[in-house]
Amino acid sequence: LKSQITYFLYYLGLVFLGFLFFYAFPSIALLSFVLVSIYHFGEQHWESNSFNTNLYKGKKIFPIILHGSTFFLVIFINNIDVVNDVLASFNTIFLDYSVLETLLIILFSIYMLMLLSFKLFRRYFIGEFLFFLLLYFLTMNSTLIYGFSVYFIFFHSILSIKDQVSYIYEDDKSQYIKKYLINALPYLLLALFFLVGFYFFVDIESINILPIIFTFLAAITSVSYTHLTLP
């Protein structure tokens, strides 16, 4: 119990430092958040496939970066006004739709060509193409929070839990998943407690909630790899 409390306080401390960095240096923090997130989401996606064990580190970086970059470009393009509103709240630069659109076409084309060109990647082509097609239509017809939440829950968090279970217990059998969820339950309940409190005691309609959520995600993502030190 003592080690869990120590780890929890350590993690909260890192998140708090992330908040301070984000508000002290918003432009640098935003860029760092996007770069870290591109790698994080791309790595998480490809870690769910067994392909990475057959590649040396220098080669497997390409699908990771291309997947993560394409993901964020799709999110930003289909929510450009909301994203720029968030950026405006931090007094930083705006994103240009035409530039993002051109960049998306180029990177997505390179990504698809890479998957088709290498035999090891070829079997992932259809899955990746359909994934981004669905993501595009999802984010085009929904709000930024809703679209990102659907992706985060079904395409990121579940895979992340599986990877963490495998890392901690060196296996992802149901008994270890159950053990992991039991150990994580106090943190889940604490998060729900603060979420309910925030909902009932904060006038959401009177404040711009997106910058707060964005900053929180940035702080969490910036220290996301610390979960690998969980005993």
Where are these regions (language model features)?
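Short, amphipathic, aromatic/basic-enriched membrane-interface segments that mark the entry/exit
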Residues: 1-7, 115-125
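Hydrophobic, membrane-inserted alpha-helices
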Residues: 10-19, 111, 129-137
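Membrane-interface helix-loop-helix junctions at boundaries between adjacent transmembrane segments
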Residues: 17-67, 71
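Alpha-helical transmembrane segments and their membrane-interface exit regions
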Residues: 34-46, 154-163, 220-223
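Long hydrophobic alpha-helical segments that form multi-pass transmembrane helix bundles
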Residues: 51-116
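Membrane-water interface signatures at transmembrane helix termini and the short loops
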Residues: 123-160
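Extracellular/periplasmic helix-loop-helix junctions in multi-pass membrane proteins
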Residues: 199-214
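Conserved small/polar residues in nucleotide/adenosyl-binding loops
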Residues: 226-231
